């Protein structure tokens, strides 16, 4: 029987003080991307475009030809070399007229492939209805598994800028990426210590209002703020991707002694040393596993998620079974951490 293992990746260290820059844990409110969207046509396809019965595509071709003074009814157009597509893009903050941005193209009709075609000039609109960019370009993609979508690097040119006067602002707002009362106060106190009292004030667990010192412009102030190191507290969290079989966890999340049963699997977690037996295996970090009785011992020390997952792998538990056991441990209170199942 094929065994499915989950790989335990320790890339996050939770529930401890972590040294980071303020710019890594907080964003500046108002400084963000804006989403753009447009409807267009991809031409030059070798019979892989929308079928002639696709009325909205034929009408779009007719409208495009009419824009260049070629009048023809949509009913008279018979072509499989054109595909109707939607174009999406992100307009970065402070993008200037003439800048280039990447675009993503997706077929919306019954085309078989848009690879090798050319996107004709397409306006990209924001939620306010205004045109902010024009998209156009050849579609070249090495992704043979998906023939109905593609990216064009620098495929759109900015035509309209989002007006935002940062230079003359006196106050801005920082938004913590992971809201936390302690972290908000930590940012407030750190900034006040560096720049002087009343520069920063925490409004809630997520929001810190900052006021620039008179000697600095807002651009200079934010540049300094983002580089200031800070110790912040992150939450204990376990993220489980059941499809890919990946568990992301802090290295020091403790699992308390317990007996957990899920489906046909029972695992005993204890700090008591195991009796020597031919079924006992030594794991890392002074842990031992009795495979005959599914008992995991830390030999007097704390057991972590790492040890539990390794033990489950040793006794041949499937990916689905591991997820079920981790959920049972969380529900029973044996794990003091948030759990997110993807």
Curated annotation (Swiss-Prot):
Signal peptide: 1-15
Keywords: Bacterial flagellum, Periplasm, Signal
Single GO term (MF): structural molecule activity
InterPro entries registered for this protein in UniProt: Flag_FlgI
One GO location term (cellular component): bacterial-type flagellum basal body, distal rod, P ring
Cellular location(s): Periplasm; Bacterial flagellum basal body
Keyword Signal: yes
Signal is among the record's keywords: yes
A Gene Ontology biological process term: bacterial-type flagellum-dependent cell motility
Pfam families given in the database record: FlgI
Taxonomic superkingdom: Bacteria
Self-association and partners: The basal body constitutes a major portion of the flagellar organelle and consists of four rings (L,P,S, and M) mounted on a central rod.
NCBIfam families: PRK05303.1
Family to which the UniProt record says this protein belongs: Belongs to the FlgI family.
Main function: Assembles around the rod to form the L-ring and probably protects the motor/basal body from shearing forces during rotation.
Identification of the protein by name: Flagellar P-ring protein
The organism of origin for this protein: Helicobacter pylori (strain J99 / ATCC 700824) (Campylobacter pylori J99)
């Amino acid at each position: 029987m094929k065994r499915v293992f989950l790989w335990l990746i320790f890339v996050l260290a939770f529930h401890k003080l972590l040294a980071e820059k303020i710019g890594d844990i907080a964003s500046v409110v108002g400084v963000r991307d804006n989403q753009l969207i447009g409807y267009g046509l991809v031409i030059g396809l070798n019979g892989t475009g929308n079928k002639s019965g696709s009325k909205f595509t034929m009408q779009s071709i007719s409208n495009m030809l009419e824009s260049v003074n070629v009048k023809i009814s949509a009913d008279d157009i018979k072509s499989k070399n054109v595909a109707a597509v939607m174009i999406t893009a992100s307009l970065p903050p402070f993008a200037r007229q003439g800048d280039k941005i990447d675009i993503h193209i997706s077929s919306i009709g019954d085309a078989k492939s848009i690879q090798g075609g050319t996107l004709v000039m397409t306006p990209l609109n924001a939620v306010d209805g205004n045109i902010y960019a024009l998209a156009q370009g050849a579609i070249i993609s090495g992704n043979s598994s998906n023939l109905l979508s593609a990216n064009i690097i620098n495929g759109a040119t900015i035509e309209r800028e989002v007006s935002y006067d940062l230079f003359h602002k006196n106050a801005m707002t920082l938004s913590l990426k992971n809201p936390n009362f302690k972290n908000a106060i930590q940012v407030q106190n750190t900034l006040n210590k560096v720049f002087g009292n009343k520069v920063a004030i925490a409004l809630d667990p997520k929001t810190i209002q900052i006021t620039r010192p008179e000697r600095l412009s807002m651009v200079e102030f934010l540049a300094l703020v983002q580089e200031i190191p800070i110790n912040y507290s992150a939450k204990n969290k376990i993220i489980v991707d059941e499809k890919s079989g990946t568990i992301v966890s802090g290295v020091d999340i403790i699992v308390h002694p317990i007996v957990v049963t899920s489906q046909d699997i029972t695992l005993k977690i204890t700090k008591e040393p195991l009796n020597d037996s031919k079924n006992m295996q030594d794991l890392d970090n002074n842990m031992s596993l009795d495979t005959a009785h599914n008992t995991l011992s830390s030999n007097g020390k704390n057991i972590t998620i790492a040890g539990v997952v390794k033990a489950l792998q040793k006794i041949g538990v499937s990916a689905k079974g591991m997820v079920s056991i981790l959920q049972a441990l969380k529900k029973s209170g044996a794990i003091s951490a948030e759990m997110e199942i993807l």
